[in-house]
Amino acid sequence: IRDSLNELLNRGHKVTAIVRDLAKVTASNPNLKVVQADVTDTDVLIEASKGKDAVISAYNPGWKNPNIYEETLKNYPLIVDSVKKAGVERLLIVGGAGTLFYAPGKMVMDADDVPAKLLPGIKSLGEFYLNTLRKENDIDWIFLSPAANMTPGERTGKFRIGKDDLVVDVNGDSNISVEDYAVAMVDELEQKKHLSLIHI
């Protein structure tokens, strides 16, 4: 969330950040308002979202949360519903690479080399996208899937955009920095080039 927030503020956007832990937001900016709430506090989500041009969701119950699978599938529909009730027309979601194809008919989340400790989080977000989000027709939504590996690095502004297949380099590796992912997310917010799934 930090990199996307910084990218938004650096481009002059007015942002309301909704976070569980206020300590997660260290930025100080006149265009930033911080609201403390849990994703299940739907009344707060709705009120904070009213009048906004778009909502960007980076919700994750926590990779170490033993209930990440159940909470992702339970809570993400609450976010979608809150956005609709707030009257916001666009929802951009920090997606996962799990539903991308690394080979014909084979999704990343079904690969044998996915670490077991990450599988519940990867599968739950993938299932939310496949079984729930793709059926959503009342708002414009984007599920922005990152590369298979997303790590802190540099903001280069250089990346490739794909659709259903994992984007890899000449060596077959799939990487992007969190900084460049934030650039892609805010670019999409501003330019409205795509509908539904895109990935970088």
Task: Annotate each PLM feature.
Residues 23-86, 193:
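NAD(P)H-binding glycine-rich loop region in Rossmannoid oxidoreductase-like domains
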Residues 130-152:
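Conserved beta-loop-beta element that borders a ligand/cofactor-binding pocket
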Residues 198-200:
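Conserved small/polar residues in nucleotide/adenosyl-binding loops
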Residues 16:
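Conserved beta-strand positions in the Rossmann-like core of class I SAM-dependent methyltransferases
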Residues 22, 77-120, 134, 142:
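Conserved Rossmann-fold NAD(P)-dependent oxidoreductase catalytic core, especially the SDR/UDP-sugar
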Residues 64, 98-103, 149-153:
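Conserved catalytic-site region of short-chain dehydrogenase/reductase
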